[in-house]
Amino acid sequence: MTIMRKTHPLLKIVNHSFIDLPTPSNISSWWNFGSLLGICLMVQIITGLFLAMHYTSDTSTAFSSVTHICRDVNYGWLIRYIHANGASMFFICLFIHVGRGIYYGSYVLNETWNIGIILLLTTMATAFVGYVLPWGQMSFWGATVITNLLSAIPYIGTTLVEWIWGGFSVDKATLTRFFAFHFILPFIITALVLVHLLFLHETGSNNPSGLNSNSDKIPFHPYYTIKDLLGVLLLLMVLMILVLFFPDVLGDPDNYTPANPLNAPAHXXXXXXXLFAYXILRSIPXKLGXVXXLLLSILILXXXPXLNTSXXXGMTXRPXTQIIYWIFIANLLVLTWIGGQPVEXPFTTIGQIASILYFTIIIILMPIASMIENDILKLHT
């Protein structure tokens, strides 16, 4: 008799994805972040659902409904802080996941990579509309500043912004629709995740050596299930330390003041997750150029397969590109720091230099380094 998991129509899918999946025998802990992102998504959907049971998306009651959740609902404070800090953990895992993809050349799996970029953009959109919901000062002004960027689009900009707002400013209609978007987007993300996995399992996973691993595969279960479980436990431990000891360390104190359209906070800072893109946005004086650069900062990832000039797949055995890669990571951290600083010298200058460096590394330095390495390889063969 054959095993049920291999014959049952539903269990067969699970079996081919998580149990009998042939996996490279040498993938490192950097490959754990895919499963961690799945856990983050599940945690966010569950906590979000419970928050939505008590939240009201009306300008007059939104702020007090969040207060009510924290004060009166059983473990409401816990659910809220898991949701808020879970989002930060989600983005940390996302950036590590993308960084690993760039380092080990996973972008050669085109469909998987492109869906990953769409996932990144969708997650950023979800985080943005979610940040508006508590209706604090930062929520309101963040929404105003970011939606206003669309007014830079020639001819239709202003009309487009007013259409998104549902009026002439961020108001009741905006909050209600943002809540609707925030509710639906995670399910769209879940669907995209399944497509992401579908395309990944067509080709199989990449591995640290960058070589074809078809001759050396092991079953996903028990080897990687137990490895992923360790990752999940570590993730949940870090998340719970954040939630229970430092719940507000990644938040903004301004968001504890109810939204007031009449006075703006000293400086509106975007959510911690998208700060590097925000700094690139602020580095360009013209509004349209800034919006274009903001989009490009993420969309440039789509060009990574095309910009790949190397003969070898990953960066494991490419020291010159490795150095440039780590400069790139340091530069990203600088951009993230600048994004949280006020718009004054020397921060603006540092931001502009870091922004130029961001694009220069991806478009010029990395391909050149790869070509030089190819030439060195030819010399030694």
Curated annotation (Swiss-Prot):
Cofactor, free-text remark: Binds 2 heme b groups non-covalently.
Give membrane topology per the record: Multi-pass membrane protein
> What CDD domains does this protein map onto?
cytochrome_b_C, Cytochrome_b_N
What Gene3D superfamilies does its record include? Cytochrome Bc1 Complex, Chain C (1.20.810.10)
Keywords from the named record:
Electron transport, Heme, Iron, Membrane, Metal-binding, Mitochondrion, Mitochondrion inner membrane, Respiratory chain, Transmembrane, Transmembrane helix, Transport, Ubiquinone
| UniProt-listed PROSITE patterns | CYTB_CTER (PS51003), CYTB_NTER (PS51002)
Give the location in the cell: Mitochondrion inner membrane
Q: Which cofactor does it need?
A: heme b
A Pfam family it matches: Cytochrome_B
- Binding residues for heme b b562, per the UniProt record? 83, 182
Biological process terms in GO annotation: mitochondrial electron transport, ubiquinol to cytochrome c
Q: Which residues bind a ubiquinone?
A: 201
| Ranges that cross the membrane | 33-53, 77-98, 113-133, 178-198, 226-246, 288-308, 320-340, 347-367
Q: Where does heme b b566 bind?
A: 97, 196
Other observations noted: Heme 1 (or BL or b562) is low-potential and absorbs at about 562 nm, and heme 2 (or BH or b566) is high-potential and absorbs at about 566 nm.
| Job of this protein | Component of the ubiquinol-cytochrome c reductase complex (complex III or cytochrome b-c1 complex) that is part of the mitochondrial respiratory chain. The b-c1 complex mediates electron transfer from ubiquinol to cytochrome c. Contributes to the generation of a proton gradient across the mitochondrial membrane that is then used for ATP synthesis.
Q: How does it assemble?
A: The cytochrome bc1 complex contains 11 subunits: 3 respiratory subunits (MT-CYB, CYC1 and UQCRFS1), 2 core proteins (UQCRC1 and UQCRC2) and 6 low-molecular weight proteins (UQCRH/QCR6, UQCRB/QCR7, UQCRQ/QCR8, UQCR10/QCR9, UQCR11/QCR10 and a cleavage product of UQCRFS1). This cytochrome bc1 complex then forms a dimer.
Name of this chain's protein: Cytochrome b
Source species, please? Hylaeamys megacephalus (Large-headed rice rat)
